């Protein structure tokens, strides 16, 4: 379906307005970012017209307690559609208008992450807020970071909800059982495309710090909405992130600033104890 200046194109501007309002309500962007972020999204969807008055009136109004200047309240989101539903509508428009060339799982994951990258604050902002909240308490800081990772759709809550979890009694005590269903199966078309893609050694692996903001491709996930937190452990630079697949509650990953082989030795346990000291 070709876009027109009329009804169908007006739908994408409504979705853009809805996503911008979602971003403000969830603390991803502030009021002063609204025009900038809207323009980035209009560029992404190749839209030339935007009725500011109508789109702003159609967007859900935020109460005073939900405006960005009240930083303690900004994560108390208004009642919006789940972000994956907004993104699904945006991707449908993108595919039908030739902006997104394929509609496979990987192609959609690459594109919706690119969308979310437009409303995800830069590393400096996220790290400053984490540091400010850490000054209150480590728990306040990590709670913020976990909520942020969900709001940015780095942790895809709709997929995590599919996981099967239960506790079973055994002769050794209770054991938590998890069947992880949040990581989607590869489409054969994606596998074929990844096999033909030019090989790249950047980033060196899926955990390296260079993944932050990376666009990704058919054999490497997009990470435009990914933000990492620096931590110093036993005098060495490390980074912290939450796992996008949440294999267990608030699944956290700590990784070296350098791409180095994983090795279990005395130094590792010193770093683990240092981390626990900083985040009791």
What do these predicted ranges mean?
Residues 1-266:
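Active-site microenvironments that recognize anionic phosphate/pyrophosphate groups
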Residues 264-279:
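Long, well-ordered alpha-helical scaffolding segments within enzyme catalytic domains
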């Amino acid at each position: 379906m070709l876009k027109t200046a009329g009804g169908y194109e007006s739908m994408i501007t409504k979705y853009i307005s809805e996503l911008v309002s979602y971003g403000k309500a969830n603390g991803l962007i502030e009021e002063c970012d609204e025009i900038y972020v809207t323009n980035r999204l209009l560029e992404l969807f190749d839209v030339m017209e935007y009725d500011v008055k109508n789109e702003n009136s159609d967007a859900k109004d935020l109460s005073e307690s939900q405006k960005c200047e009240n930083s303690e309240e900004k994560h108390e989101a208004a009642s919006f559609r789940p972000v994956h539903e907004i993104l699904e509508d945006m991707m449908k428009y993108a595919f039908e208008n030739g902006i997104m060339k394929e509609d496979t799982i990987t192609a959609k994951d690459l594109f919706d992450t690119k969308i979310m990258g437009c409303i995800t604050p830069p590393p400096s902002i996220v790290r400053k807020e984490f540091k400010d909240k850490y000054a209150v308490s480590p728990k306040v800081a990590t709670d913020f970071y976990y909520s942020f990772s969900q709001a940015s759709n780095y942790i895809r809550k709709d997929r995590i909800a599919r996981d099967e979890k239960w506790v079973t009694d055994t002769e050794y005590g209770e054991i938590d059982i998890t069947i992880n269903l949040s990581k989607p199966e590869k489409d054969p078309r994606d596998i074929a495309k990844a096999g033909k893609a030019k090989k790249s050694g950047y980033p060196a692996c899926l955990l390296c710090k260079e993944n932050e903001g990376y666009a990704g491709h058919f054999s490497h996930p997009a990470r435009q909405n990914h933000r990492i937190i620096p931590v110093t452990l036993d005098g060495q630079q490390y980074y912290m992130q939450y796992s996008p697949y949440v294999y267990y509650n608030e699944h956290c990953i700590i990784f070296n600033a350098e791409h180095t082989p994983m090795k279990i030795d005395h130094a590792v346990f010193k770093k683990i104890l240092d981390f626990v000291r900083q985040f009791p």
